[in-house]
Amino acid sequence: MSISKSLVLNEIKKFSPSHIIIGYSGGVDSSVLLNISKELDIPLIAIYINHNLHRDSLKWQIHCQQTCQRYNLQFISHSLDKVPKGESFEAWASKQRMAFFQKIMQPYSKPLLLLGHHQDDQAETFLIQAIRGSGLAGLAGIPHYKELHHGGVLRPLLKYSKIEIEEFAKLNNISYIYDDSNEDIKYRRNLIRNQIIPILQQVNPNIGQTLSRSANICAESNNILQKLLTERLQSISQDTNLIISELIKLDDDIQKSLLHLWFKQNTQQSLKSKQIKELHLAINNPSTGWQIDISNYYQIHIQYNQLIIKYPTTINDMSKEDIISWLSKNLNEEIDLTKIVIRDRKPDDKCKYRGRNKPNKLKILFQELQIPTTERSKAKIILKDQQIIAVYPFFICG
């Protein structure tokens, strides 16, 4: 199937965007998308994100800028900082790119972000998610269209293969850059693209199309499931709380799915399989006062007949600044603020006070250090990598 320029243009037009933002890397996918989209009578902004990883990244930026000048289009470049230690570059960079796109989209009434993902990207994503053991939502892969906080993101080339995109570029004399880092198999996606997909093509020459179709089926099935679960969730909820006696009337699998959906809707975060199992066990043997930590930010409590999410305590900027300043003075090491979490004290919090071999509950330490009860309420727990490293403004742990 060859790319139909008119179909792609009509697909974009049906969203009636006030402005079009294109993620433009200079690669063949985004170059073809830019070439097609420039024919629309809609203000268009091309954005180049410089990841500062490749020796030629500045050359690519200049290529993109010159192409936009030739097309008479607005061009914006943005340079990413160094990825924080311990974070996946791919996941971090994806978040950074989307955050910048949203920043550019913010002033416009109905902006539409266009990205050049294609069928081969979808096939690779399906395999990545399958390897992770993902469920329907993960296997659904890359969405064709998705609402964003402001505007939406559309991938008009998602049904076309990489070969079809390259053929379009050749027929239309579209110049583009080639990123040789795509051959580096230390990245999982490159390993799948360059080594696993070719093996699968020996079994099924149309493996890209087949896996993409499977992703679409998963997406459709997941949409149906989410609609049905959302309706059921509304019937067993009171405000943002879950009514336990109503939830446990349902089949176990439905209970677990509703627990996942309930938490996702209220926090925009996902529960891990282990956490869902713990929650499921707890609601079927409910005990008032039971609680579970879900990351450093959230707790889930059972209070009488309801399951309740405890949200993070808001610490104003001045208080946080004071806490970080205190930590810097008392902790003899460099602090990576991206890994620091500050929260209120919990009953079971423990700290290994300096010079001791094992941790003690904070209540015991407060008593031993003769910290007045009236002062203890001021305590803020400082965590790094989910470990308590200090109790502000009293002492350092570890």
From Swiss-Prot:
GO terms for molecular function: ATP binding; tRNA(Ile)-lysidine synthase activity. Its EC number is 6.3.4.19. ATP binds at residues 25-30. GO terms for biological process: tRNA modification. SMART domains: TilS_C. Keywords: ATP-binding, Cytoplasm, Ligase, Nucleotide-binding, tRNA processing. Pfam families: ATP_bind_3, TilS, TilS_C. CDD domains: TilS_N. InterPro entries: Lysidine-tRNA-synth_C (IPR012796), Rossmann-like_a/b/a_fold (IPR014729), TilS/TtcA_N (IPR011063), tRNA_Ile_lys_synt (IPR012094), tRNA_Ile_lys_synt_N (IPR012795), tRNA_Ile_lys_synt_subst-bd (IPR015262). It catalyses: cytidine(34) in tRNA(Ile2) + L-lysine + ATP = lysidine(34) in tRNA(Ile2) + AMP + diphosphate + H(+). GO terms for cellular component: cytoplasm. NCBIfam families: lysidine_TilS_C, lysidine_TilS_N. Ligates lysine onto the cytidine present at position 34 of the AUA codon-specific tRNA(Ile) that contains the anticodon CAU, in an ATP-dependent manner. Cytidine is converted to lysidine, thus changing the amino acid specificity of the tRNA from methionine to isoleucine. The N-terminal region contains the highly conserved SGGXDS motif, predicted to be a P-loop motif involved in ATP binding. This is tRNA(Ile)-lysidine synthase. It comes from Francisella tularensis subsp. novicida (strain U112). The lineage of its organism: Bacteria, Pseudomonadati, Pseudomonadota, Gammaproteobacteria, Thiotrichales. The gene is tilS.
